[in-house]
Every structure is written in C-alpha cells, then in structure tokens.
C-alpha cells in the first residue's frame, strides 16, 4: 500500500547564514510537530523521493516558523530547500481527543440535515479565528459556509464520511 503523506508546512525562504529556513506552517500543532529531534520529510521540486531531515531548532519570527535541521548547516544548503513541502506520514499524526478531527477526515464528508436531507459535501475548511468554517459544495447552488460549533454540527461519523447538522435560520440562504 502506498504511504499517505500529510502537508505540515512549506519552506518559503532562508533566514540568516546558518541554514535556518522560513516556514509557512500548515499544522495545528507546530510546537509538537517542529520539536527538536522530530523527523520531517521534504518534498523538493523535481525530486521523486522525499528527503528526511531532523529538526534541531524551532522558533517563531513574525508570522513564520524558523526551523533548523541537523542536516543543513549553511545558507547554501538551505537555499536548495526553497519551495519544498514539509510532510509527515500518516503514522506520525498525533492522536486527537474524541471530538477533534484532522481536516483530511472532514473534507469529502457528505453533510445532511437532521431530517436526513443531503445538503452537500465538505470541500474546504477555513480557519478565520474563533472557530473553523466548513465550505460545503451544494449541487446547483452556491457553496454553504457551515460554522464548526456545537449549535450547528450535531454528529460526525468519520468512518461513514457523514456529518449531521442543525440548520439554523439563515444558514443556507441562497
């Protein structure tokens, strides 16, 4: 079976002269994911196989995460990593609490009303602030924006890829 990879960030530039790289993070758990000693996998442009690296340092700088890898000690080496996607295999995903889900578990789920009517399919998840917002593609209609809050999301079945929601007034207005 093919190994499934999950995107946790992208190297967008270098930082300084000692091989640090500037990362736009795509993980909900940067402190855990980028902890020194952790293995990450870099998918470089034009390369078929990922390159394994080990985090030696992590810090925040403005809106970026700065990472140092044990295998990268110079600016010249770090330059070669620009635009690389940082991924981890499925077996490195953290265990979540019972009512928490990874984006890949939610995207693709069919969304139903409490009455059992199909509303559409989750195609994207937005993270604007206080709570996530699920973008639900509806056949022949405008996408619906569903807030991930207890008052709306009533049931999630990851195994069946189904979600049941309470339709509050105005939620699905055209």
Swiss-Prot record:
Keyword terms, alphabetized: Chaperone, Cytoplasm, Ribosome biogenesis, rRNA processing
Subcellular location: Cytoplasm
Major place of residence: cytoplasm
InterPro entries per the UniProt record, alphabetical: PRC-brl_dom, PRC_barrel-like_sf, RimM, RimM_N, RimM_N_sf, Transl_B-barrel_sf
A Gene Ontology molecular function term of the record: ribosome binding
Domain called PRC barrel: residue spans: 98-171
Cellular component aspect of the GO annotation: cytoplasm; ribosome
Single Gene Ontology BP annotation: ribosomal small subunit biogenesis
Role of this protein: An accessory protein needed during the final step in the assembly of 30S ribosomal subunit, possibly for assembly of the head region. Essential for efficient processing of 16S rRNA. May be needed both before and after RbfA during the maturation of 16S rRNA. It has affinity for free ribosomal 30S subunits but not for 70S ribosomes.
Subunit structure: Binds ribosomal protein uS19.
The record's note on its domains: The PRC barrel domain binds ribosomal protein uS19.
Entry's family note: Belongs to the RimM family.
Protein's UniProt name: Ribosome maturation factor RimM
